[in-house]
């Protein structure tokens, strides 16, 4: 039997009516799952039981949390479909056909763990890729913390204005655009004119932290885009979004997860203050003196996370692979144990 024949039989089997073995019982797939996707990156899967159907959303490495196109049970396995539009062009570059290629992720639960298989046809429709990966159930969220009762330790200056000794790239194989200029932490990911694209790196603290308050100042020039990752897991967006409608991708939002309650960003080119508190998987963001996220729960990692495991300490990391950016006065105060 050829690989293509097995692939065709696999998809045929998914559309044959079947009775879920767990029908009538609590569905063990419902909940939130931290994924370690093929290649070791961070992902996330959320499965919900709606009135008469299953639904879900997924984060695959970078980008945003997106709705799954189709979620259903096949016997005791969970199937998650994502559909990808592929444009077919002729020799002149004109689009002559748009196809929809399916990608399926099949999951098998074992207690609090998932074994998953991703099957995706090649874009030339010859053969397919099959990848194995794993998931772990995310524990229920703790109760919303009473921040007035949280005790903090001594402040730590993460950036001393003189060196990058307390920092390193998240990927040492990438090029660094980061430097210290006049006491400021500056990123300049300059691309060569007409040359090959250079992959610039993100900057992280050498030290790792649990819960904390983080204060910093950032100057976002026109069109610039960065981000502040809490414990390397949750991105608080830094971007030139002044005057735009409220969106989770805007300045101060938790990227694709939590939309600010009010637009508090300043016009491009001005220094802005961020005051971020992370306690018990709840986050508060004060931007330029205005509270825009108030002790909201974090449902999982965001795109670009170093890890999907929310139980571990992690670094502060600053996104530097997009555009230039400038930071100063980065002070972290840990929660006292």
Residue ranges of predicted features:
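Bacterial N-terminal signal peptides
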Residues: 8-19
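N-terminal secretory signal peptides that target proteins for export/translocation
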Residues: 1-6
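Carbohydrate-interacting regions of secretory-pathway proteins
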Residues: 24-337
